[in-house]
């Protein structure tokens, strides 16, 4: 059997092993854990986070919410290289569903936020 755990910066591989061992106590099993990537959280006090927060609020009127909720992305492979990773996009209330969609305004705002970030990057 193979399964995937989307762990956070608050979870270690050791804790996952202990969880599985606890719940399978008394059963004859062999457990092999591998970890292909590691969770990350960019410090909210970094320049890129401060700049995107400012851009989002100025352009959309929405105060950004910092969160590690959601799925995984390829950004998890960049963080170990020392890249300050942030992820930002359109609302995802229809993500991975039939008729997944967004509005033209959200795409335009996304463009404006990224343009702002590039202009402010000094």
For the regions a language model picked out, list residue spans one by one.
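Metal-dependent amide/peptide-bond hydrolase catalytic core
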Residues: 1-122
């Amino acid at each position: 059997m193979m399964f995937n755990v989307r762990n956070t910066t608050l979870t270690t591989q050791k804790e996952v092993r202990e969880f599985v061992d606890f719940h399978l106590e008394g059963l004859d099993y062999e457990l092999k854990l591998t970890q292909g990537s590691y969770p990350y959280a960019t410090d909210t006090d970094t320049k890129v986070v401060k700049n995107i927060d400012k851009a989002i609020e100025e352009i959309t009127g929405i105060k950004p919410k910092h969160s590690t909720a959601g799925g995984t992305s390829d950004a998890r492979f960049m963080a170990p290289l020392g890249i300050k990773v942030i992820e930002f996009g359109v609302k995802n209330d229809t993500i991975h569903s039939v008729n997944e969609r967004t509005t033209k305004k959200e795409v335009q705002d996304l463009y404006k936020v990224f343009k702002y970030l590039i202009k402010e990057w000094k």
